[in-house]
Amino acid sequence: DTNKIVPDGPTISTNFGEKAQNRTYQDLLKNKFDEHNFEQLSTSTIYKVSIDGSVKKWMDDGMYRTISFSPNGEYVMISQIKKPFSYLVTYSRFPTETNIYTKDGDFVSNLLNVPLIEELPKGFMSVRTGKRSFNWRPDKGASLTYVIALDSGDPSNKVDFRDEVYELNYPFSGQGKSILKTINRFSGIDWGTKNMAIAYDTWWNTRNRKSYAVSYTHLTLPTKALV
């Protein structure tokens, strides 16, 4: 009932004296009516369609953001948008919840709960703290990698390494195993043969980008830059 979401007063923003930068975005949510429309348009239900054409409800209604199956097809990583919404930033910084399920839809573990992000340190290379960038390793059946900022997400902090990459296996809980640290902001890994991978980092301020050869048998900071 949209009549129940008609504002009964002004929209109020509060600043608590903290330093933060926010870009100016167009077409943000502005009121409860916008929130209602956003939720209606972003909510969906996941169904499983078998080869024989049969259709079965697989996951309840939710504001699903990403769905990614493990390479062996046994597990699926699902991220959902959660409330509260924001009138200051785009939906990419709304709260999210990321969980692992079996291929049959059974819950396995909660990977991540990211709160609303309205404030970040100044700079294009700023990131939020905590675990981020969960991805399946394509060279393994069901192994995840994720990244943690070692500079508190603030590019103005002087540190030896900006990011640390971890590997996380079943049951997909806890810290996992550290496999790599990068001097600049980590931007990805191409998993190659059984003994070699190519890792990348980047730094926008200097337009610097490095590619490194990484040995699977000794996953520490690579010292040989390819380019």
PLM regions: where:
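Beta-propeller folds
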Residues: 1-219
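Single conserved hydrophobic/aromatic residue that forms the stacking wall/gate
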Residues: 218-227
